[in-house]
Amino acid sequence: MFIGNYQHNIDPKGRLSIPSKLRSLIQDSVVLSRGLDGCLELRTNQEFENYANKFLSQSNNKQQNRNYKRLLFANSLTVEIDSANRILIPANFKKMANLSKEVVIIGMGDHIELWDINAYEQFNEANFDKFNELAESMDDDH
């Protein structure tokens, strides 16, 4: 399970090191995709397939379904992990999440989120004190 909060820098060539505690749970490649709330997401190939299958089973007759699938699959890419445990984040993906140099890497259980440090700090400031409230609202989903 992916857990923890790590801060790493994107190097001048666009590479980001994957923390060793997260790397041990990943094979030689991951799927990089557009995430929710302005971040990027990393999933193992198997987890991305599981995630994608939820949407593939939905009808293409609905415009909203087609639009989401287009945005998801067009903005997803398999990236290799190099011998130094780094992934290359293409320029268009960095732009998508407004990533500059400093990145916060968040374990989200079944996937990893990559956040621009400023965006993550804003999220954290807005939500940190709402932990109990958010936990209670999750009970409504079951």
UniProtKB/Swiss-Prot annotation:
Entry keyword set: Cytoplasm, DNA-binding, Repeat, Transcription, Transcription regulation
Lineage of origin: Bacteria, Bacillati, Mycoplasmatota, Mycoplasmoidales, Mycoplasmoidaceae
One Pfam family linked to the record: MraZ
GO molecular function: DNA-binding transcription factor activity; transcription cis-regulatory region binding
Any one biological process term the GO annotation gives: negative regulation of DNA-templated transcription initiation
Every SpoVT-AbrB domain range: 5-47, 76-119
SUPFAM superfamilies from the UniProt entry: AbrB/MazE/MraZ-like (SSF89447)
Stored InterPro entries: MraZ, MraZ_C, MraZ_dom, MraZ_N, MraZ_sf, SpoVT-AbrB_dom, SpoVT-AbrB_sf
Alphabetical list of PANTHER family matching this protein: TRANSCRIPTIONAL REGULATOR MRAZ (PTHR34701:SF1)
Record's GO cellular component terms: cytoplasm; nucleoid
Entry protein name: Transcriptional regulator MraZ
Primary location recorded for the protein, binned into one broad class: cytoplasm
Keyword Cytoplasm: yes
HAMAP family according to UniProt: MraZ
Subunit structure, interactors included: Forms oligomers.
Family label: Belongs to the MraZ family.
Subcellular location per the Swiss-Prot or TrEMBL entry: Cytoplasm, Nucleoid
